[in-house]
Every structure is written in structure tokens, then in C-alpha cells.
Regions:
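Terminal alpha-helical segments
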Residues: 1-158
Length: 158
């Protein structure tokens, strides 16, 4: 099935060199989903001692799950596009009011992860509550991506 929703945004990301075409690869998508699940399992082990690390792992789980959708379609982010291109592509195709709401958390999660990785002197410390919310949001993203990949409706983006 050709996924029409978000097509204009994907084409713009391709034209801007933020995404590139690759061979669609469901095995690669599954590997990314498995890695995302492993990250979430690790979150349960570290959140008590390292809230910032747990938040970062949660974000990485969500990002890998989002990338799994693109891998299934034969798309991958370039160095230029990076995490933002993955977020933009997935939200355009699968998120928003007409899609799966889990993907709407990606932008906030990316910004929180960035603040945790590169804190300023006045940046608040990541709390256990922050880490728990990130884990909840990441689980929703991973589950939504898993359902979409398993649906068999993702084909090469042409």
C-alpha cells in the first residue's frame, strides 16, 4: 500500500537531503523495534539511580521505533536530517489528529533528551517523574510502531 498521508512532507525531506531512499527492509525494522524494547527494559533497571539516563534511553527507544517505520518504507535520515527528520517524517505520516497520538510526543521527548544531554547551568535536573513520563511516552511510540510494521501496510515510499 502506498502511504499517501504525509507524502508532501516526505518528498520535501527527500528534496532537502534530510531523508534518503534505501531498500525497504522489514528485518532491519524489526531489529530497531527489538533494540527499542531492550532500551525500555533497561529503563526499568536504571531509573532509580539515573533519571537522566533513563530519560535518554526512553527517547532512544522512541526514536528507534520511529526509524523502524521509515526503514520498512525504504527511507533513512541523512546526517543533515538526523533525529528531526525522523520525527517530522513519522509525525507527518502517522501522527496528529488523524493518526496515532503516540507520535505527537516525539518532539517534546527530543527536546527533553537534548536538555538532559547538554544541560545549561540553570537547566533543571531530570527527576524520576520526568523519566517515568518519558518511559510511558516511549512505550506508546514503540507499541504504535510495532502495530504499524506488523500491519503489512508499509511499502516502499515512491
Amino acid at each position: 500500500m502506498i502511504w499517501e498521508r504525509g507524502r508532501a512532507r516526505i518528498e520535501a525531506l527527500l528534496a532537502a537531503g534530510e531523508l534518503e531512499s534505501a531498500a525497504p527492509n522489514e528485518q532491519h525494522a524489526q531489529r530497531l523495534l527489538d533494540e527499542a524494547a531492550a532500551h525500555l527494559e533497561a529503563v526499568t533497571r536504571v531509573s532509580d539511580v539515573d533519571a537522566a539516563g533513563a530519560l535518554q534511553l526512553s527517547y532512544d527507544a522512541a526514536r528507534k521505533a520511529a526509524f523502524a517505520l521509515l526503514a520498512a518504507e525504504g527511507l533513512r535520515p541523512t546526517t543533515k536530517g538526523g533525529h528531526i527528520a525522523v520525527q517530522d517524517a513519522v509525525v507527518a505520516q502517522f501522527g496528529g489528529r488523524e493518526g496515532m497520538t503516540a507520535f505527537t510526543h516525539l518532539g517534546r521527548m527530543r527536546r527533553q533528551r537534548h536538555a538532559a544531554e547538554y544541560p545549561g547551568a540553570s537547566t533543571p535536573k531530570v527527576t524520576r517523574r520526568d523519566a517515568d513520563q518519558a518511559a510511558t511516552d516511549a512505550r506508546a511510540v514503540v507499541e504504535a510502531a510495532r502495530l504499524l510494521v506488523a500491519s503489512g501496510k508499509l511499502d516502499r515510499f515512491d
